[in-house]
Amino acid sequence: MARRCELTGKAVQVGHLVSHSNRKTKCRFLPNLCNVTLQSDALGKRVRLRVTAHALRSVEHRGGLDAFLIKAGEGDLSQTARLLKREIHKKLAETPAAAA
């Protein structure tokens, strides 16, 4: 399983820990990944995703999973999130047609 956020694409970074004497030690910086279940209002179902804490705050800020995915670019999303985004777009396109 890749250490990558399914919503933002954040992954492992490589860098140096630098001491006071400027000695550099190679280090891996891992993303803060959480297994969460998010509710999709448009689809009426819960979706389990592996996302970073930063992405979780962004989802809350945008007003839920549906709003986040609609605004998100396709490049950062995982395959699962892309399929979910397409399903949400289809469902939202059907809903106004049925109401009118």
Curated annotation (Swiss-Prot):
GO terms for molecular function: structural constituent of ribosome. Disulfide bonds: none annotated. Keywords: Ribonucleoprotein, Ribosomal protein. Gene3D superfamilies: Ribosomal protein L28/L24. One of its GO terms (cellular component) is cytosolic large ribosomal subunit. The keyword Cell inner membrane does not apply. It comes from the Bacteria. One of its GO terms (biological process) is translation. HAMAP family: Ribosomal_bL28 (MF_00373). Belongs to the bacterial ribosomal protein bL28 family. This is Large ribosomal subunit protein bL28. It comes from Methylobacterium radiotolerans (strain ATCC 27329 / DSM 1819 / JCM 2831 / NBRC 15690 / NCIMB 10815 / 0-1).
